A protein has these predicted regions:
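Long, compositionally biased intrinsically disordered regions
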Residues: 182-343
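Short acidic, hydrophobic short linear motifs in intrinsically disordered regions
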Residues: 16-28
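Hydrophobic residues on short alpha-helical segments
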Residues: 7-13
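Accessory beta->alpha helical hairpin/"wing" motif in late/C-terminal subdomains of nucleic-acid enzymes
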Residues: 37, 42, 46-69
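Short, amphipathic alpha-helical interaction segments positioned at domain boundaries
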Residues: 59-88
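Exposed, interaction-prone assembly regions rather than primary DNA-binding/catalytic cores
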Residues: 78-161
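Short amphipathic alpha-helical interaction segments
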Residues: 26-42
């Protein structure tokens, strides 16, 4: 087996400790079935189990160390279930060209990338995270996004989550704070964001709904190939401003028309349109209000086909129309950026 073929899978499994088959199947370019079988046969991976997923053996960790990637072997096998969620996020980051291997706050502040919460909890930042549900942090320009993997039965203390995100924003030198909500699909993420109040002693815990609705920046991200493309585009500075002229207009002209949350005038519908590739749902009502105030009878949401299928369930006609952004336009935008994903 060639080192370059082995390294991504070995490094990600060693870093995340446990990766399940569901995650591996969504990124076949990294976790090729033939490769995984060979790694088990050669003693670098333990045989797969439903409880622990894929795990490195001691020889696997030694193989990484010999190639300049020393990673602490697993010490807490009872945490495997939540690690599957953490790994899905980390692998999606990697597939988008965002390094998930930052080993502390100084490296994150200096180099960017994705800082997993499990690194902070294992080292010097446990006091910062406490019992918060955050799974990591990623920087998008001057906005720090606190990454969450919500579940319908998982509750949060809103002020604690806000305080945690704002503290990391200050330490990272970012100017603003937002949230990136991850999951298996847009639908499953959205369902998990619908919560109810629940009294828990003297502290009020509740579902993720208010954390989502109260955020200035909030994005939905599936942990799969589509999510990797979405993240890749989000990393391109001012990607909407660069994409708007390819679709029919410019962001600057929309600002002049007092529609800052719209991105261009759709040439087919002749209506204001908002680019939804980043799945920032919270701004849609603002864009709709601005379009109405400007005298338009509707709003176009421009997205990938898979995103469109989800958005149609939330934003019904006749006010909302939909436009699918062609792959060739996305290719032009990606080729014009400096950020390139490894897979």
């Amino acid at each position: 087996m060639k080192t370059e073929a082995m390294l991504p899978a070995m490094q990600l499994i060693g870093w995340c400790k446990n990766i399940d088959r569901r995650c591996a199947a969504k990124f076949p370019d990294i976790f090729r079935p033939a490769l995984m079988r060979a790694l088990v046969k050669n003693g670098f991976l333990r045989p797969y189990t439903e409880t622990y997923g894929w795990r490195l053996t001691a020889d696997g960790y030694r193989w990484l160390a010999a190639r300049g990637y020393p990673i602490q072997p697993d010490q807490h096998t009872q945490r495997a279930k939540r690690r599957f969620d953490n790994a899905a996020v980390a692998v999606t980051m990697y597939a988008a060209g965002i390094s998930p291997f930052r080993d502390g706050i100084p490296a994150f502040c200096e180099q960017g990338g994705y800082l997993p919460a499990f690194i902070l909890r294992a080292r010097d930042g446990s006091h910062l995270l406490g019992s918060n549900q955050v799974v990591g942090f990623v920087r998008m320009a001057d906005v720090l996004l606190a990454v969450h993997y919500p579940h319908p039965d998982r509750k949060v203390i809103l002020q604690r989550e806000h305080d945690c995100a704002e503290a990391m924003t200050l330490r990272s030198g970012c100017m603003d704070t937002g949230y990136l909500f991850c999951g298996e699909s847009y639908g499953s993420i959205y369902r998990s964001l619908v919560g109810v109040y629940e009294e828990n002693g003297t502290r009020r815990k509740q579902g993720y709904a208010n954390l989502f609705r109260q955020s200035r920046f909030a994005y939905l991200l599936p942990c799969d190939g589509l999510g990797a493309v979405q993240l890749h585009l989000m990393c391109i500075p001012e990607f909407k401003s660069k994409l708007a002229p390819l679709l029919g207009g410019s962001a600057g002209s929309m600002i002049v028309q007092n529609m800052p949350d719209c991105d261009f005038i759709d040439p087919h519908y002749r209506l204001p349109a908002r680019i939804m590739l980043d799945m920032e749902l919270c701004r849609v009502p603002y864009a709709a209000w601005q379009a109405q105030k400007a005298g338009y009878s509707g709003l176009v949401l421009a997205a990938f086909e898979t995103q469109k299928q989800f958005l149609e369930q939330l934003y019904p006609p006749p006010f909302y129309e939909f436009a699918v952004i062609p792959d060739d336009i996305i290719t032009i935008l990606k080729e014009g950026g400096t950020h390139a994903p490894p897979v």
